[in-house]
């Protein structure tokens, strides 16, 4: 239906509102009409601001799925809706469509005023507010005229704390929710005010233009006078651009117009979407969805390919025997940036510039609007950067920080600081922004996205001359063989770069896409198995101790593959449980996750699990690793997780999980449906499997050169409970049928031949010993060999080498002869599974070394050795008396004891070797069985082997040495290993004297030398992380090992 046919003429209020909200901007109404001649006009004034949350936001939040996933609980009565049993997705669509339909009929076709409040984070036309939670908190404290040290003032300023001073707040991590609690106690209005959506937009435009508290405070006072507490809460959410209404921009855009998402992808403009696509029946032509000058677009991204060889990596690029060439570029550690330039005689220098980041943030204010912009950090230096024939262009590249003093790239975190400094002091040496260009997408009004990379590169080299260390074309290497990758990767390792990007020169530019035309390659680190995994959070577990009452660990899922969805076997949101993550989170990470998921968690009901969305290990019956609460994937967040390896596990529905997972960072830039899926996981698993086979092959080669010095560790077998599937159980022929039977039947079913008297521990004649055995169910034979033909196994018993025994040993050297001590030990053992006061005795023990008079085979001797520890103490049996204890203790030499100084935290054993208690193996087992060690400082560094790198001796006043000593103690306390060899380290900590230019220079020099040494290693060998001392400090402070990437040294 064509909405223009029903359009009405604007009434007086609508005309006044149009002038009010659009006439005070950077463009006048006449200029707006010139730019958008067909923009729609509303026939009536906009809805009250309260209608926005009463009929849209609140119903969306209340629209929650049932745990079974079939129907939904609709909006609460009185909040703009009614109860319904349609699907969650349909209910959500109906809420949004109903609001849009009402707007079109009651207000008009100009939906832009509402859309910019619904999607404030996508509104590029309004300037930035420059307001964070703490600043808004200070303003509200002054507006309400309360003491910032009062309970409410304190709660506003400390909104991340779990309850402020009173400990009763439920809005921990949610600043807007905390504002609602505080404002509701002293609101100027009980009911919503009269401000319309247009009025709020006008005030927000003023707020964005305001600079400093003196201009911001009167605007907040006006909001406070005219809004109630709930309106203020939603206003704060809009200012912070954090709506949390349970629907994404994709949903709103697609419901507004079928082409809205496509137009937004190439323009990043809500204004264009609303003003050009107000008629649902109007469709865009293909050329209208292409890139345009001075309109931000979504760039192409590089794919990460988890392959085992360079050959496979290159093959995935799509090269062929006929066209084997591919390109290799350095992956830069900076910020992805697109630059637009157009001729404009109205600005100094004749050319106008615009800069946007990958997330569509406008950085023109920072890098410059024109060649004559005296406040620019970059464009004032670009007078000779382009060929004279260039009228306009669009470039794609990376903005990095370059230190001109050392002529090297420095970490990305310094970029904005360097740019601000260059604005003030354009000729100053030191760090500066450098724009490295690698693609051109438009030249002299001609879009180039459909041209090949080869053609685009030729156009780039003709159009861009460059300015040294200001704007440069990123160099690349042409290659035809996979062998070309390794030496270049060595070089980027030595230069502390991020990695490489491989590109297919025959590929077109794919807007808003990530595919195999561009593939990134990163070096692997010792503590990880490669690229971090981006998984969607589907469940949460409440913590204890200092994390009590809050979610301290999270269950992550892997999305089902498209094949499952298309076949109808799973919903689009179905995830399989994969890993439980609790380590690596800072306090601010927990607060951020709470901030983005507040109100979306639901209690886990074992009787009605949400199987449409989450499948646990063990299915509905067993529900392994079931969380305390769960969340829909579409309502959740994506987190980046790294780990030591992948391992099989029936505890998770994937059948696999990560060993020792650790949180790396929150991926707010990734939607839930871009997180790891089953197909991507299978590629990863195949890579890890191939790498593991290669590693084992190398170990086997090394083992052939080196004879084994220790026998292999065997699993312990509980006496009387031998594994029926094992062919070499501890007691294959004497295991009892029922271990709980009375001792009078202890030897029932066993056959004995007593060959001599008993000497130890009890003296007993041969007849007396035979009677003892018969009294307890055993059968006595006078010959060892069975001539009955029944296949009986007869156990010879002897304590002296009498003639019969000597003859037997000579005739049958492979036969085992058992001492009477075994009979006595079995009889005095307490029966298992009985109470101590019942005093029931009698239990068949596995043979031990003291039970063997003669061992007929190596296998018997080994099994007997496995039944006791290295001191001879039985695993299955109690000590008989004090004499036996004394004998064991006398056999303990002083070398067997491990002092603190001799303990090797790396191996979890004493340095003297042996088969003693393996602590790391024990702790690993605990974690794999679900016991969390994340809160224990004494184990936080246990997988870290740390090499400390300090300035040369004689430099400084010993401050670096003192600092290193403290950091080493943190590592040791956390059960880490301080090593003296770089080759064995997982982490290298660079420690210099207190901050200053000289210490920064020392840090860079030390880090550069270390990276050069590491780059000489055999390619494929994992690398240690080279970090600053602050990594140890902050990890200690947070009580968990934090992500290393924020602390890169050099």
Swiss-Prot record:
Where, by residue number, does Mg(2+) 1 bind? 398
Q: Provide the residue span(s) of the region labelled Disordered.
A: 1-22, 691-711
The record ties this protein, via Pfam families, to: BRCT_2 (PF16589), DNA_ligase_A_C (PF04679), DNA_ligase_A_M (PF01068), DNA_ligase_A_N (PF04675)
Q: Where does Mg(2+) 2 bind?
A: 498
Q: Where does ATP bind?
A: 329, 331-332, 336, 398, 438, 498, 503, 520, 522
Describe the location of the BRCT domain by residue ranges: 742-840, 936-1049
Protein name in the entry:
DNA ligase 4
Q: Which organism is it from?
A: Neurospora crassa (strain ATCC 24698 / 74-OR23-1A / CBS 708.71 / DSM 1257 / FGSC 987)
Species lineage, top-down?
Answer: Eukaryota, Fungi, Dikarya, Ascomycota, Pezizomycotina
State which gene encodes it: mus-53
